[in-house]
Amino acid sequence: MSSVLPTPVLPTPGRNINRGHFPDDFIFGAGTSSYQIEGAAREGGRGPSIWDTFTHTHPELIQDGSNGDTAINSYNLYKEDIKIVKLMGLDAYRFSISWPRILPGGSINAGINQEGIKYYNNLIDELLANDIVPYVTLFHWDVPQALQDQYDGFLSDKIVDDFRDFAELCFWEFGDRVKNWITINEPESYSNFFGVAYDTPPKAHALKASRLLVPTTVARPSKPVRVFASTADPGTTTADQVYKVGHNLLLAHAAAIQVYRDKFQNTQEGTFGMALVTQWMKPLNENNPADVEAASRAFDFKFGWFMQPLITGEYPKSMRQLLGPRLREFTPDQKKLLIGSYDYVGVNYYTATYVSSAQPPHDKKKAVFHTDGNFYTTDSKDGVLIGPLAGPAWLNIVPEGIYHVLHDIKENYEDPVIYITENGVYEVNDTAKTLSEARVDTTRLHYLQDHLSKVLEARHQGVRVQGYLVWSLMDNWELRAGYTSRFGLIHVDYYNNFARYPKDSAIWFRNAFHKRLRIHVNKARPQEDDGAFDTPRKRLRKY
């Protein structure tokens, strides 16, 4: 990882940043994912996913005991949500396709759900009718429960063929209008945090539960849900299973790209990437070579794990050296499919951490993912946080981190085209706040301003970043956190029919980045203002 960065060639505008500081073809948008917003878990022919099963069998492992059955009801309110995107003047909207909504049984042979096809056709057509470019994620972690039951999901290489078939169906049905595809969102997160690495679930890959049997009830198994897959080899560690899941995710990505390039590229002319989670790995002691090397290893285990195979067909050298035969090798044919299987790199950035060197564990049988890299992480140094915490846990606000991450990718991964596919911050869902108070999100406003300024600074220095998608468009159901964390530009009233209201950050984003503002630097507002985002707080209205 680079420690010496070039001097900026242009001044940056700081918190006065707006669309005019970026080139006309730079994309601004916001994102969501299917399970987190759609709801309608038992509507429209959708089958259950592993998240349906997990949240219903183990509600105690979701922070507020909730689930995504209703989420924020975007399945029924998608036209309203697209109207919001249009009012904000965004170029793009990122959403994911629910695999079990398209293929309730997980595979083509189990049947195609035409109601699901119709829903996404309607969504895409509505976006295009409103001059909004769709960015579509194929896999945002909602494995069909049917495939989990059949062969343990991504712990089995059987899923590669089923994912390829699912992807091909999506290209056939939607590719005439969708030109920007993301195969997999955060494979590191899925393999690790939502996988089998820790003693704290959800361990979604390993779930082997009774299916959701009928549309209105949820089957609760009489015995505990298995937390480790029954097909695991005797004697393997949970970390070994994490790498197995990651390996199959990479093969699934490559298979999807292959089928697109073989059958659709010439006529549809779409582009592809994976959305990879990043974190600025800052050496705890920058004068200590061991800590500098540890920070580099940490970035390998976070980002390089999934990026390096797309360049060389091999995992990062540090991972191969430390893991040895525990890390599977790619065959020559698999390497051919992996190398170059991207047009751009999607970067998800939220936070940063200090990294220091650590000794490897003496007992290899007790190896877990975070001991494999021989590094420690901490959010503080000498009692001082690396950045202020957004809430009670995990997200330290470190805007300079996105600048360093972008440079590291440029310098160490062949200078790719980059889109920021997620960047955002949460606030705690404080139910004591009034609606007016809940819309005041100064922390998010400053977070976005400061991070965008650092993105612009990186562009000035030659990083080929071409778009920025906020996470997220709206408050939604946040996986393990349930409804306790709010990431949205748009406030969603969970208690009154999921009514949508703009927060201060949404109003600022519209006024600074509306697509009408492409021409003049420092122009403050769109030329035509319908006032929808400036409703006085005493007269808040639903969209």
Swiss-Prot record:
Instruction: Supply the enzyme class, top level.
Output: hydrolase
Q: In which pathway does it act?
A: Alkaloid biosynthesis
Catalysed reaction(s) here are: deacetylipecoside + H2O = deacetylipecoside aglycone + D-glucose; deacetylisoipecoside + H2O = deacetylisoipecoside aglycone + D-glucose
State what protein this is by name.
Ipecac alkaloid beta-glucosidase 2
Any one Pfam family here would be Glyco_hydro_1
List the GO cellular component terms.
cytosol
Q: Which family does it belong to?
A: Belongs to the glycosyl hydrolase 1 family.
Enzyme Commission designation: 3.2.1.-
Source domain of life is: Eukaryota
State the gene name recorded for this protein.
GLU2
Keywords for this entry? Answer: Alkaloid metabolism, Cytoplasm, Glycosidase, Hydrolase
Q: What positions constitute the catalytic site? A: E186 (proton donor), E422 (nucleophile)
Spell out the residues of the site Controls the gate shape and acceptance of substrates: W394
